[in-house]
């Protein structure tokens, strides 16, 4: 009987024999059986195309803000009167150099530190002083024109309420913490916002900057309304509920140049760019960096353009029409982001006005390339400090006015009251601290200090007590 091992060995021998026969029969020239794959043609190198210069516009883009907005810094009605220097009597103990006379018929009205004011006691035993004007002999409280004027509550309570709002706490949450009515908190916010807008306008002007970044922050307004509403009104409120917070900043000093609420259209872009231009000096044209919003190009061209007469191309025929073109010193670049399925898939840079070499030269002080990273980081800070624009919160505003009021508060709080760790400077000599703590080695600085607008960190109480003069003051005041 033949074992199974015999058949296994026989099959193995047959396989080896077949392999040898195939190798002997197979042709040695493999090219005759398997021809080589033809080489693919090398790709034709793309020709470098110079960007086509901007031909210009036949008409200047309209800007409603330039035509209808009043002058943010009105000029004085007359020349300043002579200063009043006290020559007799004891030295004044109360500093009145930061107050102005509000009497419209006074010759010294609106002039700060002119020596025409002196303290005149506390009327009715109150907390605030009464001031006397030596020119018109009028009396007024030192809180006139501030949020503290006419309030029966303590000034510490008002300052703490406003501070909580500036740190991102909602109106109702602040009311519960301090056990006051929410309408009272809202009224204090409205009064503080009006005062702080004037504060920002007074200090932020004629700035010389190297770079400005601008971005839009998505926000949602609450569509909730008490009572019964019609279907058409509900649809209208829902359509206008999504809004954008327009933000502009200086990356070098992190100075917040402007904040506003509106839609993402050309009209809003024109309005916000107009606000930024009002802050800059007339001869200042920094490098502007934005996202890929195309209407921003028209807005910058409106405010930094000029009429240019093109040259003739032919000897005969009518002369070409004048063109509205950007001024030669305008530098503007965009960071265009491509998003698919809520994911960032591509980022490329686009130089709109100027050349790549001049744009890189403008970026040299910060040592970076074209980007909007600084203002993107600022967007997160704004969401953390402004309750109305936070993500997935229940502190939304019902109208644009409420959002603007909270943004006006944060605008001043960010620039003058909030020290930034990236702006601090080392002290020449460490300062000892109270107790057993380590010595102070860093000098805190705010964006306003880094930009040269002030020399100290303001407290929120000092900001709210500051009486804004009605017009700019001479240098050194």
Question: Language-model segments: which ranges?
Answer:
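Cysteine-centered motifs
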Residues: 19, 34, 63-66
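Low-complexity, intrinsically disordered tandem-repeat tracts enriched in small/polar residues
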Residues: 23, 38-40, 53
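Residue-level recognition of single "structural anchor" positions
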Residues: 42-45, 51-477
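Single-pass alpha-helical transmembrane signal-anchor segments in small membrane proteins across taxa
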Residues: 4-24
């Amino acid at each position: 009987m033949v074992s199974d091992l015999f058949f296994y060995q026989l099959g193995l021998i047959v396989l080896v024999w077949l392999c040898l026969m195939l190798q002997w029969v197979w042709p040695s020239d493999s090219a005759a059986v398997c021809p080589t794959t033809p080489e693919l043609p090398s790709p034709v190198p793309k020709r470098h195309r110079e960007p086509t210069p901007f031909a210009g516009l036949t008409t200047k883009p309209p800007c409603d803000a330039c035509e209808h907005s009043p002058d943010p810094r009105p000029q004085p009605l007359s020349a300043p009167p002579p200063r009043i220097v006290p020559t007799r009597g004891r030295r004044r103990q109360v500093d009145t150099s930061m107050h102005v006379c509000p009497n419209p018929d006074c010759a010294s009205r609106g002039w700060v530190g002119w020596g025409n004011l002196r303290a005149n006691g506390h009327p009715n035993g109150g907390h605030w002083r009464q001031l006397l004007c030596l020119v018109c002999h009028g009396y007024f409280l030192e809180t006139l024109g501030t949020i503290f004027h006419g309030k029966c509550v303590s000034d510490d309570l008002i300052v703490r309420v406003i501070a909580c709002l500036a740190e991102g706490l909602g109106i109702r949450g602040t009311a519960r913490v301090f056990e006051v009515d929410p309408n009272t908190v809202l009224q204090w916010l409205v009064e503080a916002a009006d005062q702080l807008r004037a504060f920002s306008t007074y200090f932020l002007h004629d700035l010389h900057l190297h770079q400005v970044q601008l971005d839009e922050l998505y926000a949602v307004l609450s569509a909730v309304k008490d009572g019964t509403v019609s279907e058409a009104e509900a649809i209208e409120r829902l359509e206008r509920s999504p809004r954008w917070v327009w933000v502009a900043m200086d990356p070098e000093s992190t100075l917040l140049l402007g904040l506003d609420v509106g839609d993402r259209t050309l009209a809003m872009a024109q309005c916000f760019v107009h606000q930024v231009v009002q802050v800059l000096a007339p001869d200042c044209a920094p490098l502007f960096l934005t996202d890929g919003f195309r209407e921003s190009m028209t807005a910058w061209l409106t405010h930094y353009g000029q009429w240019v007469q093109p040259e003739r191309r032919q000897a005969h025929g009518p002369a070409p029409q004048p063109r509205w073109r950007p001024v030669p010193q305008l530098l503007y670049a965009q960071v265009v982001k491509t998003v698919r399925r809520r994911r960032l898939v591509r980022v490329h840079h686009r130089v709109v006005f100027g050349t790549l070499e001049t744009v890189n030269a403008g970026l040299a002080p910060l040592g970076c390339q074209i980007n909007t990273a600084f203002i993107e980081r600022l967007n997160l800070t704004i969401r953390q400090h402004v309750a109305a624009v936070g993500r997935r919160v229940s502190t939304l505003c019902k109208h644009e006015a409420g959002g603007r009021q909270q943004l006006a508060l944060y605008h001043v709080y960010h620039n003058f009251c909030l020290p930034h760790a990236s702006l601090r400077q080392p002290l020449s000599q460490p300062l000892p601290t109270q107790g057993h703590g380590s010595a102070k080695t860093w000098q805190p600085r705010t964006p306003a200090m880094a930009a040269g607008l002030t020399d100290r960190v303001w407290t929120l109480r000092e900001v709210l007590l500051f009486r804004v003069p009605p017009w700019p003051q001479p240098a050194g005041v």
